[in-house]
């Protein structure tokens, strides 16, 4: 199956995700300008490539997804959350979160896929109100968190990190519960991990994911910084 080369002049144009090859790659090239990233996410496509390689755009089949209303939290983690060890904040340290995520060792990887180019692109998306960080703080220090993109009633998780036990888990669960209150319909986890499977994430066939995503894209986007005041339930 052919891999499509993206146009420099039309960042909104992507081939149908169904045309991805067996590895999930649907297109190559282009750039990471906000218009292109937002167009990609709205179609169920995301960038994932190594430093020095061309930009590869993915739409894997199956897709690992968590429905916020199916979130599962184990007893031990609930106890940790009840103890109030971590304070969860939104969008107060986005650049620090993505930088920490870029430094997390990954099994089988010698480098990072979160390149400088990638970091700057998502910082730009954050400044535009589409990319967000969820942070776990303790004693005034950042201990863990995650970042991702929000469009419509969907959150596209990109990466997470932890510098202390359960910090990223507390951030993730707190965010998922917040998303449920907001009426979000799905959290895109991209590819399967044992870590997220424990929270109830499942593999969906691409067709099911794209159908659910199309419904989620019909809802308004919570654009802007999710600081404490902005993040309050309506």
Curated annotation (Swiss-Prot):
Keyword Flavoprotein attributed: no
Pfam family, one: Leu_Phe_trans
GO BP field: protein catabolic process
Domain of life: Bacteria
ATP-binding recorded as keyword: no
Subcellular location: Cytoplasm
Disulfides per UniProt: none
Keyword tags: Acyltransferase, Cytoplasm, Transferase
Reaction it catalyzes: N-terminal L-lysyl-[protein] + L-leucyl-tRNA(Leu) = N-terminal L-leucyl-L-lysyl-[protein] + tRNA(Leu) + H(+); N-terminal L-arginyl-[protein] + L-leucyl-tRNA(Leu) = N-terminal L-leucyl-L-arginyl-[protein] + tRNA(Leu) + H(+); L-phenylalanyl-tRNA(Phe) + an N-terminal L-alpha-aminoacyl-[protein] = an N-terminal L-phenylalanyl-L-alpha-aminoacyl-[protein] + tRNA(Phe)
Any GO molecular function: leucyl-tRNA--protein transferase activity
InterPro entries the UniProt entry points to: Acyl_CoA_acyltransferase, Leu/Phe-tRNA_Trfase, Leu/Phe-tRNA_Trfase_C, Leu/Phe-tRNA_Trfase_N
One GO location term (cellular component): cytoplasm
Signal peptide: none
EC number: 2.3.2.6
UniProt function note: Functions in the N-end rule pathway of protein degradation where it conjugates Leu, Phe and, less efficiently, Met from aminoacyl-tRNAs to the N-termini of proteins containing an N-terminal arginine or lysine.
Similarity comment text for this entry: Belongs to the L/F-transferase family.
PANTHER family: LEUCYL/PHENYLALANYL-TRNA--PROTEIN TRANSFERASE, LEUCYL_PHENYLALANYL-TRNA--PROTEIN TRANSFERASE
The protein's name: Leucyl/phenylalanyl-tRNA--protein transferase
Lineage, top ranks: Bacteria, Pseudomonadati, Myxococcota, Myxococcia, Myxococcales
């Amino acid at each position: 199956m052919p891999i499509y080369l993206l146009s420099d002049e039309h960042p909104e144009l992507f081939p149908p995700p169904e045309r991805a090859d067996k590895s999930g790659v649907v297109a190559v090239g282009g750039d990471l300008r906000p218009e292109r990233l937002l167009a990609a996410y709205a179609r169920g496509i995301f960038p994932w490539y190594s430093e020095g390689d061309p930009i590869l755009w993915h739409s894997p089949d199956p897709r690992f997804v968590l429905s916020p209303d199916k979130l599962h939290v184990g007893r031990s983690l609930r106890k940790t959350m009840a103890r109030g060890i971590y304070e969860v904040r939104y969008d107060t340290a986005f650049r620090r979160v993505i930088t920490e995520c870029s430094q997390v060792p990954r099994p089988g990887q010698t480098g990072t896929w979160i390149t400088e180019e990638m970091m700057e692109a998502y910082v730009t998306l954050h400044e535009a109100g589409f990319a967000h960080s969820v942070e776990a703080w303790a004693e005034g220090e950042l201990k863990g968190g995650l970042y991702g993109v929000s469009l419509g009633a969907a959150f596209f998780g990109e990466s997470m990190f932890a510098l202390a036990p359960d910090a990223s888990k507390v951030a993730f669960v707190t965010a998922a519960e917040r998303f449920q209150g907001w009426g979000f319909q799905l959290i895109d986890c991209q590819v399967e991990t044992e870590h997220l499977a424990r929270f109830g994430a499942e593999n969906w066939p691409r067709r099911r994911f794209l159908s659910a995503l199309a419904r989620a894209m019909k809802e308004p986007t919570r654009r802007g910084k999710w600081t404490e005041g902005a993040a309050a339930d309506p």
